Amino acid sequence: MQKIFSRRSFIGNIAKGSLYSIAFSSSYRSFANPSSFKSFEDDKSKKINIGIIGAENSHTAAFGKLFNIDNIFPGLEVKYVWGETEAFARIAMKKGNIPNIVSHPNDMLGKIDALIVDHRHGKYHLDAAMPFLEEGIPIFIDKPFCYRKQKGEEFLSKARQLKTPVTSYSSIAHSFATFDIKNQISQMESKENIIMYGPLDLDSKYGGVFFYGPHLIEPLIYIIDNRAVKVRVNKNNSNGSASIVFENGISVTLIFSSKNRGWQTFVETKKGFVEIKATVEKKVPSKSDLDMVTMFKTGKEPRKHSNILHGIAILEALEKSVNSGGWENVDQ
């Protein structure tokens, strides 16, 4: 067994060779005949080998279980994993029944058909994914997509140039439950004031608001379907609350819970605030897993690039407000 590279040495090596080109535009895209991505839509018998970068997060073992143990998607298998430490990689390997550990992420080049990037801190995601982007490998990047919007714009611009499918989302947001809640709220006569509860540690070593923030911010983007213009955080030690104002006049209050791991949504009505609960049963496979696999097979991205980047812009504004204590504009 070769020595597992440290996260720092890996990122340093990748960063030296990373080139970006800058642009900002996005739309829903389907790569029917891209120059680099190879669609498996017409070859149902083709097996798709998946590699995962990052094993510190429990999601990695969960992906292994999904594909390798539960076999929810026949023909897809997680074949390789790289861990930030050898211990992380071995735990994911055991729990997810993943057959191979690599000592460097790039050892997976030429061996996989799809990539999942799954660091706990989003600042490592894009440098790790770049060599695979350049090879036309479809990429799912776990939340958060990245740590800075500008770098995300550059990465997605290159993805469009190379016609490499890329997506990223919170599994809480990209769910049948969230779309059901969105449908319920869209039919309400009054929805100007919304309150959402969810866990968030402003002092998390994995990027503060960027760690659990996507599970609160991305559902809002899906549900409200409008652009946030300004935010303000009220910090109380590592917890607190935040206010977000959207272009259409909707005002949202986020409550950062510290004892409850769940998420709740309330909308103000004439009778007071009413909790909106999903009315759909839990499905297997989940929408997040189903759309990820569909992209791996067909190249159809389930989410607009502009939507992904707007979520990062909101998180950056929240981070600035944590430090300033005041209102911060959301970069458009």
Regions found by a protein language model. Name each.
Residues 194-262, 306-309:
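Rossmann-like dinucleotide-binding domain that binds NAD(P)(H)
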Residues 320-332:
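C-terminal capping/lid region of NAD(P)-dependent oxidoreductase domains
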Residues 233-237, 244-312, 318:
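NAD(P)-dinucleotide binding in Rossmann-like oxidoreductases
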Residues 17-24, 28-95, 187:
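N-terminal Rossmann-like dinucleotide-binding module
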Residues 94-156:
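Beta-loop-alpha module in the N-terminal Rossmann-like domain of NAD(P)-dependent dehydrogenases
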